[in-house]
């Protein structure tokens, strides 16, 4: 009978949260196995905008976001993938949107000499130039200089390759079944582990359905597309619109946010019904990622109604005054719940780490460092003893 393999840390899920967990573990000298039931990294972590929106977060998300920022910069250097530090652009097309940006800028003033400016207010001319918009589109805007952008299709794979080089083992096409303290039963047999990290995004409702129901986790399906368009100049950063100002927590905590929400909902009920977040990122090849709509439920329909895609294209063409040619369409899914994170040690040394809203690229690496790293630090004596057995 062959002996059961043993690792200090087994991570279930090779998306950005799982990769972050593997990084936190290998940084602490652990032996690490990452398993994923897919043959490639193909979940939400490659289907997103690649927008690392640190500034509009608050509370725990802000802590994780700022920790993530350092890790993204380090990884981009160490793993050698493209990262852009030009910051996020926000176009205000109405006075209430500009008012919200002014409130945020006043709240995020640098507290000490030399501290970074987090929100730079822009004139209408400035935002139109930086975001390739026609004259007369904006009443003003802002730049959020701390924010970063990556190309998600390449970043996750580059991080995996970097981790491989540091001795982390990846076992793809391998599904986790029963998970209990010390052991993961996989579709290739059992594996023993000092610590198990479950980073399976919305599939948490399959692995731990009772816990997922307790947290009110459902799935959120998003329609996305990649387009080419003959814009007069490139975007100088991810571009958010008023629809984004009613989403991210630091924006929604501003007094003007309810004015923006009420007006947009009254003016464009059909877009509000799609739960639209009209935003854009431009990839290094010049094509633009366009999104997104949101549909929440226990399952996500495999059939994508064309009205969402039509609305995304219409809004693109009306904003930029340029035709968009669709290159690709896809659907993304993430877990969503009342709180932004589901973090629980469901059994001793079994950590569940799920970002339960659409900010996992922004916060996932920091979450992994703060939750998994802190757990390993606390349990380092046990770990060293078990590794030496
Ligand atoms: C369309 C879209 C746009 C988004 N835009 C942004 C953005 O711009 N900025 C931002 O911060 N966030 C964004 N997000 C959110 C972000 O992408 C996610 O929060 C993040 O990628 C989640 O990472 P993850 O590692 O938890 O999940 P995933 O990347 O989905 O990885 C989970 C992995 O678990 C594996 N798995 C599941 N069950 C099992 C099992 N039983 N056994 C083995 N493996 C299993 C899956 O195969 C998958 O590979 C967006 C999300 C979507 C869908």
For every predicted segment, state its role.
Residues 52, 82-83, 202-323:
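Active-site substrate-recognition segment that forms the wall
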Residues 5-7, 186-195:
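Core beta-strand elements of the Rossmann-like FAD/NAD(P) dinucleotide-binding domain
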Residues 275, 284-289, 295-389:
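C-terminal catalytic lobe of FAD-dependent flavoproteins
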Residues 63-64, 91-100, 142-161, 303-308, ...:
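Short beta-strand to alpha-helix junction loop
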Residues 26-46:
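Glycine-rich FAD pyrophosphate-binding loop
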Residues 9-33:
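N-terminal Rossmann-like FAD-binding beta1-loop-alpha1 element of flavoenzymes
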Residues 142-180, 193-194:
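Helical element adjacent to the flavin cofactor pocket in flavoenzyme catalytic cores
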Residues 49-130:
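Dinucleotide-binding Rossmann-like beta1-alpha1 core, especially the glycine-rich loop
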């Amino acid at each position: 009978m062959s002996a059961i393999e043993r690792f200090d840390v087994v991570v279930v899920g090779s998306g950005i949260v799982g990769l972050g967990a593997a990084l936190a573990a290998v940084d602490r000298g652990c032996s690490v196995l990452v398993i994923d039931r897919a043959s490639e990294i193909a979940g939400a972590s490659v289907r997103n905008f690649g927008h690392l929106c640190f500034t509009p977060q608050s509370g725990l998300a802000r802590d994780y976001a700022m920790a993530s920022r350092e890790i993204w910069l380090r990884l981009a250097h160490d793993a050698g993938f493209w990262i852009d530090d030009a910051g996020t652009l926000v176009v205000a097309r109405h006075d209430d949107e500009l008012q919200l940006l002014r409130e945020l800028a006043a709240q995020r003033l640098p507290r000490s000499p030399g501290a970074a400016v987090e929100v730079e207010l822009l004139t209408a001319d400035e935002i139109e130039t930086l975001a390739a918009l026609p004259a007369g589109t904006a009443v003003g805007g802002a730049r959020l200089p701390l924010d970063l952008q990556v190309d998600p299709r390449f970043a996750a794979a580059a991080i995996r390759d970097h981790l491989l080089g540091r001795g982390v083992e990846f076992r793809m096409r391998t599904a986790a079944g029963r998970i209990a303290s010390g052991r993961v039963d996989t579709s290739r047999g059992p594996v023993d582990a000092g610590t198990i990290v479950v980073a399976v995004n919305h599939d948490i409702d399959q692995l731990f359905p009772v816990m997922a129901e307790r947290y009110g986790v459902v799935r959120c399906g998003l329609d996305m597309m990649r387009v080419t368009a003959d814009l007069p100049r490139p975007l100088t950063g991810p571009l958010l619109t008023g629809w984004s100002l009613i989403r991210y927590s630091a924006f929604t905590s501003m007094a003007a946010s309810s004015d923006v929400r009420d007006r947009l909902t009254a003016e464009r009920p059909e877009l509000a019904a799609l739960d639209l977040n009209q935003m854009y990122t431009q990839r290094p090849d010049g094509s633009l990622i366009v999104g997104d709509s949101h549909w929440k439920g226990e399952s996500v329909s495999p059939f994508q109604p064309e009205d969402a895609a039509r609305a995304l294209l219409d809004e693109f063409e009306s904003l930029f005054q340029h035709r968009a040619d669709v290159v690709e369409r896809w659907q993304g899914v993430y877990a969503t719940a009342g709180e932004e994170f589901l973090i629980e040690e469901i059994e001793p040394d079994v950590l569940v780490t799920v970002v339960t809203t659409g900010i996992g690229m922004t916060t996932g690496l920091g979450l992994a460092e703060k939750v998994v790293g802190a757990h390993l630090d606390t349990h380092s004596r046990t770990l060293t003893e078990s590794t030496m057995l």
